[in-house]
Amino acid sequence: MDSPRLPVRYPRAQGYRPSGDENRYGAWQWKCQVKGAATGKLAGKRVVIKDNIGVAGMPMLNGSALYEGYVADEDATVVTRILDAGGEVLGKAVCENFCYSGGSHTAASGPVRNPRNPDFMTGGSSSGCAALIVAGECDMAVGSDQGGSVRMPSSWSGCVGIKPTHGLVPYTGAGPIEQSIDHLGPMAASSLDCALLLEVIAGYDDSRDPRQVASLQSKPYSELVTEGIHGLRIGIVGEGFGAPGSEGDVDEAVALAARSLVKAGAVVEDILIPVHAEAMTVMFASSVDGTLSTWSDQGPAGPNPGGYHPLGAIRFFQEARKSRAADLPDMAKTVMLFAHVMRARYGNYYSAKAQNLLRPIRAAYDE
């Protein structure tokens, strides 16, 4: 019995990996024009795709030497939606090694430099996406975000990025880290374009992504974003400032942005959420066991019960991991060793405890 496959609807040439002046920021992983429908919401828009998201006929390296030689044989759902909406996919943007870095220095292909100042990083892990947008080489990009990987490069490089509500955008056909923290999100040079791209890629994916409910629909975000923010209530979380590892000039930049929102009509209030200081630790503890399962066994599918599994990518990863385990990034090895030790000593006790703690943490933000 043949397994279902994701559709590939639009023709494309083989493409190539650019070098030299054509890739002066190290942000391009692959160039290949794929023209979508003749009309649609994204007609005339040039889009790049983060290199942990499948585009049929193009290499998908996930920032790692381990994936060298793998060529995707399916289009991720977000890619199909972009093409159906008239967008033109220009190629793949470099991402960090296994998407597990907030910098832009870990990709096997080399560092991604910030077009604002090439001596600085773009932020990661959607590093190439931000660099190509800021350099004017594309209009939009689709990145992925588990712990800031859309938001940080957008902030560091000076473009717009959104981590959508969990499950709003289907993750189908993208390389995961852990299902509870995996998000695909739009990036663009303007808020309007970012909203327009979200409008196109959001919505239910015919049961392929089990995080979604059948009633999930996209909204006219490109219209809603033009309504302004008058009366919008925004909380500034006190525990997010002056924390260990934070920097004063960054705190001041956020405070300055908050004041500008007040001038635009928003209501900005200082709030306290004591559990915020522990939320990152709990998030890591709750996801590390699933991350081990992804990197040890499933690879480009991850534990995805009831959802779609890209079989070609899974087979390649499993064989590569057996024959070229040395190509696994150091951070992945560290996380896997940590998770193995935790399993051996404590089973899933602390992972389960962290899952239980997520509910009161969510409730604290909602109060």
Residue map of PLM features:
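Extracellular/periplasmic catalytic domains that process cell-envelope and extracellular macromolecules
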Residues: G40-L42, L83, I133, G228
